[in-house]
């Protein structure tokens, strides 16, 4: 069986820059050219959001992107079809970077567990991040995902106790995903009680209690913040800022141009 792209990438000694993108945002037809632009501009891993009608853990930008994605015809079946085309180079240059799906469990349950894993693997999906899947209840799903060589990523937050950090580190296949602050996705402002120093101490604590790599997301919007997070973590995730920078695009080509221009400012 071919080695998982994420597993292969994480063996390299490099700091990672991950892009979060909501399919078919801001206009229908944007996904393939945007994926190409992100790959060409240096995205190491691309997270694709699974649009959901009630994304309670997301900030307003990602909520709006999800609603527009659904309005533009994206379902989980459609998303896998788009990824398959991207992997084959149909409608864009062949996409070879790892692709991770991030979303809620409901669409996967509706799809059917093994059916989804089969179709996702065939499409070229490398991993899954399901924020509402508790690690304590994930054992059976982890075993099935392992059978498909699918990476599964779990979340760590600033209030996660050390023993739970260690459990999450052990259960995450290749890396874990740290929320930088206690907030909805894309909130750059620190929450009450959070300071730059407290966030740094939190990430140092995560490092002490993990053996695998971890990335940091939520609220990272420019090169300065990326480089700051790289001091403590193995990767930085930029999502809301990317969506904001392409939101005004009226065509797929303009969305791709704006995505590429923005992404190059982060490297």
UniProtKB/Swiss-Prot annotation:
It comes from Chlorobium phaeovibrioides (strain DSM 265 / 1930) (Prosthecochloris vibrioformis (strain DSM 265)). Transmembrane segments: none annotated. Pfam families: Trp_syntA. Its EC number is 4.2.1.20. GO terms for cellular component: cytosol. The active site is at 47 (proton acceptor), 58 (proton acceptor). It comes from the Bacteria. Tetramer of two alpha and two beta chains. This is Tryptophan synthase alpha chain. Signal peptide: none annotated. The gene is trpA. The alpha subunit is responsible for the aldol cleavage of indoleglycerol phosphate to indole and glyceraldehyde 3-phosphate. It catalyses: (1S,2R)-1-C-(indol-3-yl)glycerol 3-phosphate + L-serine = D-glyceraldehyde 3-phosphate + L-tryptophan + H2O. Belongs to the TrpA family. It is an enzyme of class 4 (lyase). Keywords: Amino-acid biosynthesis, Aromatic amino acid biosynthesis, Lyase, Tryptophan biosynthesis. One of its GO terms (molecular function) is tryptophan synthase activity. Pathway: Amino-acid biosynthesis; L-tryptophan biosynthesis; L-tryptophan from chorismate: step 5/5.
